[in-house]
Amino acid sequence: MSQVNMRDMLKAGVHFGHQTRYWNPKMGKYIFGARNKIHIINLEKTLPMFNDALAFVERLAQGKNKIMFVGTKRSAGKIVAEQAARCGSPYVDHRWLGGMLTNYKTIRASIKRLRDLETQAEDGTFAKLTKKEALMRSRDLEKLDRSLGGIKDMGGLPDALFVIDVDHERIAITEANKLGIPVIGVVDTNSSPEGVDFVIPGNDDAIRAIELYMTSMADAVIRGRNNVAGGTEVYAEEAAAPAAE
């Protein structure tokens, strides 16, 4: 199993939290101190927690389970889409639609509509329509692809969520909690770790930090899939153990 090291995290700026006045007391135990009114995250705590999360993801992937990557804010979306595509994982990079997990039956119907429109665009159906109707369907296709393109091949609910910025993606976390889906999350000093099974205390804004998290997670998925072992549906119970206090 490949692990992230302290130097990687320092270079990426994982240790830089938010301004001290915005801190969340629930993250106090992960804060080393403050510099220029910015909280500094204790990487000696982050390092083992990050590597535990990577090990969990690798074992999930080894059991042929699906890990959904979620990062919809501007600094995260592009990186999330690129790394999820690299490891063949479902992802949400634009906007979390309410009910994406808890109302998956409706989401699945929208995915079917997306696939139908993709087929029509490819087989020449659009060319046979009036210009107005073709334009309407093209716009519908574009809208659906932006919202659901990352999960159209998921084929069912994911077995875990990896979330960048737990405050920004709180609806996704709440839905996962309701369904008992384990959540791995990057939690900054201004956020609450509640509802997150595998907390990664760290900077959730810096692009280099987000690249480190996403690249490492994608690598863990690839390693797991390259070392498939018997396909056991494991680790939902394991996720309950390290839950945030």
Swiss-Prot record:
GO terms for cellular component: cytosolic small ribosomal subunit. This is Small ribosomal subunit protein uS2. CDD domains: RPS2 (cd01425). InterPro entries: Ribosomal_uS2 (IPR001865), Ribosomal_uS2_bac/mit/plastid (IPR005706), Ribosomal_uS2_CS (IPR018130), Ribosomal_uS2_flav_dom_sf (IPR023591). Keywords: Ribonucleoprotein, Ribosomal protein. The lineage of its organism: Bacteria, Pseudomonadati, Pseudomonadota, Gammaproteobacteria, Pseudomonadales. Pfam families: Ribosomal_S2. Belongs to the universal ribosomal protein uS2 family. GO terms for biological process: translation. The keyword Transcription does not apply. One of its GO terms (molecular function) is structural constituent of ribosome.
